[in-house]
C-alpha cells in the first residue's frame, strides 16, 4: 500500500502508530515499511496510537481527568519511549534515506534529558550520554500544541533544523502554535526554519512548496 500511495501527487510518506516503536523489539515488525521509506526517500510520521491487538485506550474511560491523563500524560510518555528506541538503538541505521517524523517534540525528552544524563552517569557510565544521541540524522520533531518555553527547550536539545511546524495541527488549528513560535526566544533564523524552511528543505523532492509569505496567507 505504501508503494502504491507514495506515487500519488502530494504524498510524502505514511503514518505509523506510536506503539510500533515503544521498544526495539516492537519496531522490528516495521522494518519493511522503514525499507520502503528509505527506498523512496520518504517520510514516516510516528503518531501516538495502538498497533493491532493492543489494549486501547490504556487510560480507562471514566478515570478522573481522563482527557489530561490520556491526551497528554499517556501520549507524552509513549512518545518519549519512541524517542529512546529511535535515538538510542540501531533500528534506523540501515535506513539512512528514510525520514522519520514524530509529533509533540518527541514527548518529554527535552525536559527529561538532564535527568537521563545524570542517571546514565550513575548507572551506566560506560554508555553514551542520552543527550549526545538525540540529534539523529533524518529524525524530525513537530512542535504543534506546545508553548514558547517547550519550543525553546526543543531547539536547545535537537537544533532548530530538526523542528517542523503544523504537521500535526489540523484538529487544533494554528493560532496557538503561531503564537508560541512567535514568542519563543530562538531568533529569527530559527523561527523561519521552523515555520517553513525545514519542511521545504527535507520534503521538496516529494512535494511542491509555496514561498513562506504565500503559505502564511
Language-model segments: what does each one mean?
Residues 14-16, 44-46, 100-102, 139-143, ...:
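Hydrophobic faces of well-ordered beta-strands that scaffold small-molecule active sites
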Amino acid at each position: 500500500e505504501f508503494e502504491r500511495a507514495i506515487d500519488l501527487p502530494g504524498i510524502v510518506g505514511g503514518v505509523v502508530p506510536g506503539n510500533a516503536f515503544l521498544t526495539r523489539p516492537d519496531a522490528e515488525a516495521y522494518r519493511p515499511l522503514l525499507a520502503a521509506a528509505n527506498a523512496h526517500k520518504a517520510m514516516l510520521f510516528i503518531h501516538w496510537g495502538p498497533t493491532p491487538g493492543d489494549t486501547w485506550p490504556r487510560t480507562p474511560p471514566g478515570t478522573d481527568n481522563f482527557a489530561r491523563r490520556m491526551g497528554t500524560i499517556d501520549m507524552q510518555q509513549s512518545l518519549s519511549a519512541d524517542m529512546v528506541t529511535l535515538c538510542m538503538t540501531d533500528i534506523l541505521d540501515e535506513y539512512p534515506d528514510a525520514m522519520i517524523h514524530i509529533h509533540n517534540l518527541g514527548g518529554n525528552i527535552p525536559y527529561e534529558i538532564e535527568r537521563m544524563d545524570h542517571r546514565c552517569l550513575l548507572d551506566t557510565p560506560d554508555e553514551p550520554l542520552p543527550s549526545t544521541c538525540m540529534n539523529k540524522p533524518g529524525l524530525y520533531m513537530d512542535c504543534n500544541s506546545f508553548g514558547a518555553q517547550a519550543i525553546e527547550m526543543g531547539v536547545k536539545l535537537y537544533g532548530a533544523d530538526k523542528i517542523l511546524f503544523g504537521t500535526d495541527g489540523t484538529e487544533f488549528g494554528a493560532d496557538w502554535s503561531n503564537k508560541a513560535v512567535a514568542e519563543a526566544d530562538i531568533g529569527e533564523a530559527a523561527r523561519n526554519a521552523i515555520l517553513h524552511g525545514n519542511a521545504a528543505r527535507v520534503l521538496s523532492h516529494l512535494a511542491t512548496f509555496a514561498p513562506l509569505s504565500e503559505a502564511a496567507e
